[in-house]
A protein has these predicted regions:
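C-terminal helical cap and adjacent loop that interface with cofactors, partners, or active-site loops
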Residues: 263-265, 282-344
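C-terminal substrate-binding/catalytic lobe of Rossmann-fold NAD(P)-dependent oxidoreductases
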Residues: 27-63, 169-170, 174-175, 179-306
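Short, well-ordered loop/turn and helix-capping segments at boundaries between secondary-structure elements
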Residues: 22, 219, 327-331
Length: 344
């Protein structure tokens, strides 16, 4: 498979290059950057030296890029992919968008939260949370890769919603992200002196991943679900940790909870069910496509607390994109993604 990456110099883009380089059936075709056109990617990211010796191109010759590619990954901020997708409508080239442009069934929700007019509302995109929508991804031409917070948060509670074990009201998600989640562009809040030895909430009651999580929760619950979602910035490079709180329905047992998780995830290669009373740790998923999930019930409040963590650049972005590519092309779903986490 010939794979091209549009927006190859951002954190998600360069992570795609790392994973594609180690993929047994993928060949990197074209890599682009509008701000660094003509430069060698290895000069910007020396860890790629000797492995990926390609120069960055402009994406202006989009039709030519598509002709040279079996699949195009778009790793650009929101607002760009919809233009690319619209231009390539009818092309044989498959598209996987790592941004937010195609994640919503109702494009008006996108416009409300992203404050951008959607330019490709007629697109037929599949939401690419692979473990939940594998069959749809398999036949897709355009896949919307989920967000990092959303992947972690959705996987945490969907089994409990599907099997009607928790109330749909009062769900609270307290999530934390490493600084790479904010992207590579220069921001005062992402500077070393701002992040180091500090911890803060941001996007309170306004984060764009909120409606994305609600959309999938509602689909599995069979009714509208509204959540309280608060993200925080951790002084670490990588990782997403979501602590999710929900009220258990009357009479629900620990055995039913475990059965629900096993029913949905027991055979999933990348989801590691740690079980009751186990608190997952970011260090155990770093650099990998794994999802580590643990939970505990609180008899005092009648709530369940689900703790879930992923690497935001792998399962939360590039890794899941490669996983979707594998499914789209009918090859081993774990191809190129079997790396163990980096410990220490």
């Amino acid at each position: 498979m010939k794979a091209s990456v549009i927006g190859a110099t951002g954190y998600a883009g360069v992570e795609l290059l790392r994973l594609l380089d180690g993929h047994p059936e993928a060949e990197i075709a074209v890599i682009t950057s509008e701000s660094s056109t003509g430069e060698a990617i290895a000069s910007m990211y020396p860890h790629l030296s000797g492995r990926i010796e390609k120069n960055l191109q402009s994406m202006q010759e989009l039709d030519a890029i598509a002709a040279a590619s079996d699949v195009i990954f778009i790793a650009l901020p929101h607002g760009h992919a919809m233009k690319i997708g619209k231009q390539l409508r009818g092309s044989k080239t498959k598209i996987i968008d790592l941004g937010g442009d195609y994640r919503f069934k109702d494009y008006h929700v996108f416009e409300q939260w992203y404050k951008v007019k959607h330019e490709d509302p007629e697109a037929q995109a599949v939401y690419g949370l692979t473990e939940l929508f594998r069959d749809k991804v398999r036949g897709a031409q355009l896949v919307a890769n989920p967000g990092c917070y959303t992947t972690c948060s959705i996987l945490a509670l969907v089994p409990l919603l599907k099997y009607k074990l928790i109330e749909t009201k009062g769900i609270v998600i307290d999530a934390k992200s490493g600084t790479t989640g904010a992207g590579r562009s220069l921001k005062a809040g992402s500077l070393y002196c701002s992040v180091n030895e500090s911890f803060k909430a941001y996007g309170v009651a306004s984060h764009r991943h909120t409606p994305e999580i609600e959309q999938i929760y509602s689909e599995f619950a069979g009714e509208d679900v509204v959540i309280q979602f608060t993200p925080h910035l951790l002084p670490v490079d990588r990782g997403i940790y979501a602590t999710c709180y929900a009220q258990l329905k009357q009479g629900v047992t620990d055995a039913q909870i475990e059965e629900a998780y096993q029913a949905m995830y027991g055979d999933e290669f990348f989801i590691r069910l740690r079980g009751k009373g186990v608190c997952p740790e970011l260090k155990n998923i770093r650099g990998s496509n794994y999802v580590d999930l643990g939970w505990q019930t609180d008899k005092h409040t009648g709530r369940i607390i689900v703790m879930n963590c992923i690497d935001n650049l792998v399962k939360g972005a590039a890794g899941q994109a490669v996983q979707n590519m594998n499914v789209m092309f009918g090859i081993d779903e774990a191809a190129g993604l079997r790396q163990l986490p980096l410990v220490p």
